Amino acid sequence: LTAKDQKTTFQSLVSDTLGEDCDYDTVRNIHDNLNELMAEAKESPDPLELSRPDVKHLLERSGVPEEKMEHFDKNFEEAVGEKNTLLASNIASVKTFQIETPDIIVKVNPERSDLVETREIDGRRCLVIAIDDHLEVNGIEVR
């Protein structure tokens, strides 16, 4: 699989595995845990390869419920192959953490994804972004 295909395949695996439970917190946990794995392997001369058990452990560690994992092995083998692996550098976004809606794109420092959460406010799903000190809109500092 090409790098782009690996990324698309991983995204589909996550989406298909989680189904209706594919929420912001779980996807953020997967992102954070994947980046943590890459940071731990940074000193190694070999690229970090993720086998089926590695990806399964990543998802479980990220809070994917056990009942959602029952078809994971079959889905991984169909999408990636029984003996094939995914390169972590192809499936992770270490430089950006991007949240999109049809009208809005929010880019967050990947190490600070904890500043963003989803909440229901007045019956609507909303992104809530913690602002610690400095806020700019189109280059203009606002209070």
Residue ranges and their predicted role:
Residues 60, 64-143:
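C-terminal, beta-strand-rich globular interaction domains
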Residues 1-93:
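Long, hydrophobic alpha/beta structural blocks
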